[in-house]
Amino acid sequence: NDVVVSEDIAQKELLGAFNGRVYFTGSVGTEHFLWETDGSNEGTSTIFEFDEQLPAIESSNLLSTQNDYLVFSTISNGETEFWRTNGAAAGTFKLSASGSALSSLVSIFACNLENKVLLRCFDSNGEGQLWVIDGTVDGTEKLADVNVFYLNSFPQDQHVPYEEKVIDGVLYFG
């Protein structure tokens, strides 16, 4: 079956499935929301309204799903914000403050490691960083500076292989 979502919702960005529902960001007029759907118009509803000062969500991406929450990022005005939701308004909140170290990062890899999400990122200077998110604001922190390559530094026709694997609770990447 095709998923039916109201045509009144603009700028839809699919996040993914979680706990039997599909989550996405979308706008109605100048207001920006986190939505959930079961695939029908009747089963589609907002669960959270983003900050009213947010002019527009340029993009949003699912980073990871855990047992009881999902982590996603939004980009607005060139700043990245990391969010988590458990599917309820009260369980949806920003993991990073505007202007914080996280707001300049672009995630190139996310994976689950035990009950946490690991992010391999680079900042606007191409400097690599490894971050961990445990689903709380206090548990969102930088683990290390890491030498990851800056994807834009390679010619467009050159494929640069990289891979990440979690084996026995250890993250390997290169």
Short names for language-model regions:
Residues 1-174:
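Feature 14080 marks short, conserved micro-sites in well-ordered regions
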